Structures are given as C-alpha cells and as structure tokens.
A protein has these predicted regions:
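Flexible, glycine-rich beta-alpha linker
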Residues: 1-4
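C-terminal substrate-binding subdomain of Rossmann-fold SDR/epimerase-dehydratase oxidoreductases
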Residues: 13-139
Length: 139
C-alpha cells in the first residue's frame, strides 16, 4: 500500500529523488505486517490471558518522528529530503503509543524499521507501475 507513510515516502524518494515533508516532528508508530501476523498467533495461544482486554500491538521502539523515518529512507535512497517549515500536512496524526501491556505478556516486534524500509525499497525496484497486474510477490 503506497498510502502508508513509510511506503509513500520511500516511493517518492526513489521515483523523484527528493521529498518535501511538513511537520517533521510529528510522531507516528509503525509495525511490519509480519509482526501483525505473529501477533494473531500470539493472541490465539494466549487467549486466556488476553480475554476481555484491549492491547496496542507493536513495540515502543517503533515510535518515530517523520524526520527520523525520512533520514533512514534518505540514507538508503540518496534522495534529498526538504523539511518545510511553512505549510501543513493534511494528515494531523501526531502520537506515541505505549505497548507495555502486550509486552508484559511476552509479545514484541521482530522486524525493525530499517529492515522494513529495505524490503519496501527492494519491492519498489521490481514493481512496474504501468502494469496493473504487477505484484512483487511473483518476482
């Protein structure tokens, strides 16, 4: 999904060679789809401990500012990042999430941000955006 922040930023950096970012200090939390899948299994195995509770799924180490994410992507793509001080991002989400509750049960993420960025970049290299049926999974 290219509408997700990391995927969108990496795509623009690779396609255009630059990225303009507003509100660089806004915080977001991230999780890799593989870790989400692992959490489903974790939940099924720990249903008796988790029943009737609500959990944030992720890891405290995955709370990043937009600037931190951009700097990681820039190092891997050599794209120019411009942090614009004037203007606004239409997406006003700015938050840090605590994952202490699920961590206390033994769940934590395994895929770090930089590994996820590497995967996105490698996928973007093989996707033919002119072909509706291109899917990196087949390469």
């Amino acid at each position: 999904r290219l509408d997700l922040l990391v995927n969108d930023f990496a795509n623009k950096c690779m396609r255009d060679g630059y990225l303009v970012v507003y509100e660089k200090n806004f915080m977001r939390t991230f999780i890799h789809v593989d870790d989400i899948a692992r959490c489903f299994t974790f939940g099924m195995k720990n249903v008796n401990k988790m029943i009737n509770n609500v959990y944030n799924v992720g890891d405290n180490s995955m709370n990043y500012s937009k600037e931190e994410v951009c700097n990681m992507i820039s190092k891997k793509t050599d794209a120019f990042i411009h942090f614009e001080e004037i203007g606004e991002d239409a997406d006003k989400r700015n938050y840090i999430v605590s994952y202490d509750k699920i961590k206390s049960l033994g769940f934590g993420t395994k895929i770090k941000m930089e590994e996820g960025i590497d995967q996105v970049i490698e996928t973007l290299k093989v996707v033919d955006f002119g072909n509706t049926y291109t899917n990196a999974r087949y390469f």
